[in-house]
Regions:
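Gly/Pro/Ser/Thr-rich low-complexity, intrinsically disordered segments predominantly at protein N-termini
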Residues: 1-135
Length: 136
């Protein structure tokens, strides 16, 4: 079977599109939809976020966000868990957490699901590290 080539779009065009469920990511001009999280994936994600935030939020060290869109370095990705150091959390004009995160996470966690490409997940982690992330 012959597949038609996918039309590439710009990052700005991608960001104007409606959000999808599960989330879609913009990688090298292409839209790649993440698989729908299953029970085990969601359990691991929830436990990680709960424990990281229990340690990091009270002391205002870091905050873990689930499925947060992070746009930086020509890509727009949605890590399973994105952890930002407190002083790097984007704020809006009212001093509240911004809706848009145009920065790399300090830590990125991807929970590999059976339907995911290990190469794609690894490349997203490397993209975060190359942009200045501390751990992935």
């Amino acid at each position: 079977m012959v597949q038609a080539p996918q039309k590439t779009i710009t990052l700005d065009e991608f960001l104007q599109l409606a959000e999808t469920k599960p989330a879609s990511e913009y990688i090298k001009g292409a839209i790649v939809q993440k698989p729908m999280p299953q029970g085990k994936h969601s359990t691991i994600q929830g436990e990680l976020i709960t424990r990281i935030n229990a340690a990091g939020k009270p002391q205002r060290i870091a905050w873990a966000f689930p499925e947060l869109r992070c746009t930086f370095g020509g890509r727009s990705i949605v890590p399973d868990v994105a952890i930002f150091l407190w002083n790097r959390i984007p704020l809006d004009a009212d001093g509240e957490i911004a809706n848009t995160f145009n920065a790399h996470p300090d830590w990125t966690i991807e929970i590999l699901s059976p339907a995911q490409s290990q190469t794609k997940v690894t490349n997203n982690i490397l993209h975060c590290l190359n942009a200045g992330g501390q751990m992935g």
